[in-house]
């Protein structure tokens, strides 16, 4: 992605919600490489899909020759950003936040190159400059530059102030000052001149721009990426089970892959622009091919492959594809023990059972059938498979060979209704 027209290219992909002084920023980018940053607060032990667009934006800038700084908010994570939140966040302990900082730093690392010469990425933590700052320094050096009038007029704060059931505490009100100071610190320390973030960060970003100008007399810029929405109006990045996480222990690579496979046709080409590094020309060609093929579109598979590889690597992608293929074909011989552990985690419904159970009881316990009587009829109708093999004996008791890896048995009713038995 060429640096000189990088902003235009991001706009073509729909990746720019707002930008401060676009003309001046374009001029600055045309002069040569810049340093830029994006912040990630440790409000959980993993990043989720909502973090992926700004994180990939950092990567896009690095590919164009710029120097990315990934800032993990060890200090701001102790406070909690109130921006557009309906209620105050629960405060977490320092130990918990530090543990989350370490996890998030490790999650961010594979997306950026920390050893590529002049534009090698930097990992920073704002606890380094806030950890030992006393309250008088904070008030005199930072607080004096902020107008309360302007702060309460920021949309994110206004929404909270106008809620009868929820005001805003001083601790959250001060978050804006902390994030603003991050920008000023990174500008002084690393020459950072651009902050990128989600569109909910606009107020915090503009505060940082103002503070940097006041403290260092430097012009800096802000760019926000849009809040990702789906064509049907439902929230992006959520499933019935909650958020889609980047940590494979919280959302398995198989579940992650399936999330993208299930993208609606109305969203898939837009999401290819947001979440992959395919060129606009390649995406348009794929859309044209899908339109004229007369078959199911290929775009969802391309999207699922590209994003799963980005987040979980080639090994995670191959495991996800292997599990998908085995569930579709009914043949489980290619599945490893680790694959079954993914299924047990979140891939299919799971039930724990004691050894010695019969098939009818397993169907009831797994909620594949409402009663033993109904289970008996379904088994007799040849609609049940055990590990891909048909079983039509209602009196069937599980055998040792049904326990794959000594632990797992996969039941299927009909073509699509699965349950994994994990034997105690």
Curated annotation (Swiss-Prot):
<feature type="binding site">
    <location>
        <position position="238"/>
    </location>
    <ligand>
        <name>ATP</name>
    </ligand>
</feature>
<dbReference type="GO" id="GO:0003723">
    <property type="term" value="F:RNA binding"/>
</dbReference>
<comment type="similarity">
    <text>Belongs to the class-I aminoacyl-tRNA synthetase family. TyrS type 1 subfamily.</text>
</comment>
<feature type="domain" description="S4 RNA-binding">
    <location>
        <begin position="357"/>
        <end position="414"/>
    </location>
</feature>
<feature type="binding site">
    <location>
        <position position="175"/>
    </location>
    <ligand>
        <name>L-tyrosine</name>
    </ligand>
</feature>
<comment type="function">
    <text>Catalyzes the attachment of tyrosine to tRNA(Tyr) in a two-step reaction: tyrosine is first activated by ATP to form Tyr-AMP and then transferred to the acceptor end of tRNA(Tyr).</text>
</comment>
<keyword id="KW-0547">Nucleotide-binding</keyword>
<feature type="binding site">
    <location>
        <position position="37"/>
    </location>
    <ligand>
        <name>L-tyrosine</name>
    </ligand>
</feature>
<keyword id="KW-0694">RNA-binding</keyword>
<dbReference type="InterPro" id="IPR002305">
    <property type="entry name" value="aa-tRNA-synth_Ic"/>
</dbReference>
<dbReference type="InterPro" id="IPR002307">
    <property type="entry name" value="Tyr-tRNA-ligase"/>
</dbReference>
<feature type="modified residue" description="N6-acetyllysine">
    <location>
        <position position="144"/>
    </location>
</feature>
<protein>
    <recommendedName>
        <fullName>Tyrosine--tRNA ligase</fullName>
        <ecNumber>6.1.1.1</ecNumber>
    </recommendedName>
</protein>
<keyword id="KW-0648">Protein biosynthesis</keyword>
<comment type="subunit">
    <text>Homodimer.</text>
</comment>
<keyword id="KW-0963">Cytoplasm</keyword>
<dbReference type="Pfam" id="PF22421">
    <property type="entry name" value="SYY_C-terminal"/>
</dbReference>
<dbReference type="Pfam" id="PF00579">
    <property type="entry name" value="tRNA-synt_1b"/>
</dbReference>
<keyword id="KW-0007">Acetylation</keyword>
<dbReference type="GO" id="GO:0005524">
    <property type="term" value="F:ATP binding"/>
</dbReference>
<feature type="short sequence motif" description="'HIGH' region">
    <location>
        <begin position="42"/>
        <end position="51"/>
    </location>
</feature>
<feature type="short sequence motif" description="'KMSKS' region">
    <location>
        <begin position="235"/>
        <end position="239"/>
    </location>
</feature>
<dbReference type="GO" id="GO:0004831">
    <property type="term" value="F:tyrosine-tRNA ligase activity"/>
</dbReference>
<dbReference type="GO" id="GO:0006437">
    <property type="term" value="P:tyrosyl-tRNA aminoacylation"/>
</dbReference>
<dbReference type="InterPro" id="IPR002942">
    <property type="entry name" value="S4_RNA-bd"/>
</dbReference>
<feature type="binding site">
    <location>
        <position position="179"/>
    </location>
    <ligand>
        <name>L-tyrosine</name>
    </ligand>
</feature>
<dbReference type="InterPro" id="IPR001412">
    <property type="entry name" value="aa-tRNA-synth_I_CS"/>
</dbReference>
<keyword id="KW-0436">Ligase</keyword>
<keyword id="KW-0067">ATP-binding</keyword>
<dbReference type="InterPro" id="IPR036986">
    <property type="entry name" value="S4_RNA-bd_sf"/>
</dbReference>
<dbReference type="InterPro" id="IPR024088">
    <property type="entry name" value="Tyr-tRNA-ligase_bac-type"/>
</dbReference>
<dbReference type="InterPro" id="IPR024107">
    <property type="entry name" value="Tyr-tRNA-ligase_bac_1"/>
</dbReference>
<dbReference type="InterPro" id="IPR054608">
    <property type="entry name" value="SYY-like_C"/>
</dbReference>
<keyword id="KW-0030">Aminoacyl-tRNA synthetase</keyword>
<dbReference type="InterPro" id="IPR014729">
    <property type="entry name" value="Rossmann-like_a/b/a_fold"/>
</dbReference>
<dbReference type="GO" id="GO:0005829">
    <property type="term" value="C:cytosol"/>
</dbReference>
């Amino acid at each position: 992605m060429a640096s000189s027209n990088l902003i235009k290219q991001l706009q073509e992909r729909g990746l720019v919600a707002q930008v401060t002084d676009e003309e001046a920023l374009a001029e600055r980018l045309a002069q040569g490489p810049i340093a830029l940053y994006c912040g990630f607060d440790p409000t959980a032990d993993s990043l989720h899909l909502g973090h992926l667009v700004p994180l990939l934006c950092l990567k896009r800038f690095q590919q164009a020759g710029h120097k990315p700084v990934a800032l993990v908010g060890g200090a701001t994570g102790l406070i909690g950003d109130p921006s557009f939140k309906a209620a105050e966040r629960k405060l977490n302990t320092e130990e918990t936040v530090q543990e989350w900082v370490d996890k998030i730093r490790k999650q961010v690392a594979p997306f950026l190159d920390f050893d590529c010469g002049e534009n090698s990425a930097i990992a920073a933590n704002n606890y380094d400059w806030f950890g030992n700052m006393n309250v008088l320094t904070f008030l005199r050096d930072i607080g004096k530059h902020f107008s309360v009038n302007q702060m309460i007029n920021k949309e994110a704060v206004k929404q909270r102030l106008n809620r009868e059931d929820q005001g805003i505490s001083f601790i959250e009100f001060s978050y804006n000052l902390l994030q603003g100071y991050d920008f000023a610190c990174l500008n002084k320390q690393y020459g950072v001149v651009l902050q990128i973030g989600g569109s909910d960060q606009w107020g915090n970003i503009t505060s940082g721009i103002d503070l940097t100008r006041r403290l260092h007399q430097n012009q800096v810029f802000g760019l926000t990426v849009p809040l990702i929405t789906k064509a049907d109006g439902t929230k992006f990045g959520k499933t019935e089970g909650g958020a889609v996480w980047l940590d494979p222990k919280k959302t398995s690579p198989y579940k992650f892959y399936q999330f993208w496979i299930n993208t609606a046709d109305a969203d898939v080409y837009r999401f290819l622009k947001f979440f992959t590094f395919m060129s606009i020309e390649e995406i348009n060609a794929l859309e044209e091919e899908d339109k004229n093929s007369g078959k199911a579109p290929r775009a969802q598979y391309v999207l699922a492959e590209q994003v799963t590889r980005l987040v979980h690597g080639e090994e995670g992608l191959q495991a996800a594809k292997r599990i998908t293929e085995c569930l579709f074909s009914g043949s489980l011989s290619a599945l490893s023990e680790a694959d079954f552990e993914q299924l047990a985690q979140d891939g299919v419904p799971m039930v724990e059972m004691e050894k010695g159970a019969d098939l009818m009881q397993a169907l009831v316990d797994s909620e594949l059938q409402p009663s033993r009587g109904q289970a008996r009829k379904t088994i007799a109708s040849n609609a049940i498979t055990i590990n891909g093999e048909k079983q039509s004996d209602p009196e069937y008791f599980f055998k040792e060979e049904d326990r794959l890896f000594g632990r797992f048995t996969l039941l299927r009713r009909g073509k699509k209704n699965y349950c994994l038995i994990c034997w105690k």
